[in-house]
Amino acid sequence: MRTQKKWLEEQLKKSNAQWKIVVLHHPLYSIKGSMNNLFQRTMFNPLVEEYGVDLVLQGHEHAYARMTAHGENGEAQAPVYTVSHCSPKNYYIEFDKRFDKFGTGSRYYQQIRVHGDTLTMNAYDATTNDLYDAVDIIKDKTGKSRLEDRGKEIPEALIFHSNGGKKEEAFQKRIDKYKQRKGIQ
């Protein structure tokens, strides 16, 4: 992993690109309760922050989640961290308050577009191709970013396919608790 860190730092250091996107298999902030990814986070997240990465695309955990960074005044800003998958397998996740949006029980893919001072990340349900999440990262002339969270108006899909059992019951309770916290019907 140290070799990967060294390589990533070299690439980010020499990059003068307006938009920086990092792709990782394991997420820096896990959405699975049994995983913390602390080693990965301490290796790579300082680089994400130091070199002004705008978007971190991650996988491995077989669900969807988006987390945004926040500035000193609490305003949403880059980097945006997404965890996504397109596998038929789904995992139980934790509904950590740091995340802005979750999706369970379906598959998701992202479309990233850049137009001038705006990077748009749209996430789609791979089964229906319906828009599921949407974020615009907008940079001013100084390079400071702000976020427009267009996904907050799109209902979260918290689908759970139960075969019965204690694990399934516990996960359904976590879903219900999260929905209550967010005011989701």
Region annotations inferred by a language model:
Residues M1-V22, L28-G33, P46-L55, E61-Q185:
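Metal-dependent phosphoesterase/phosphodiesterase active-site architecture
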Residues N36-M43:
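Charged helix-capping and loop-helix junction motifs
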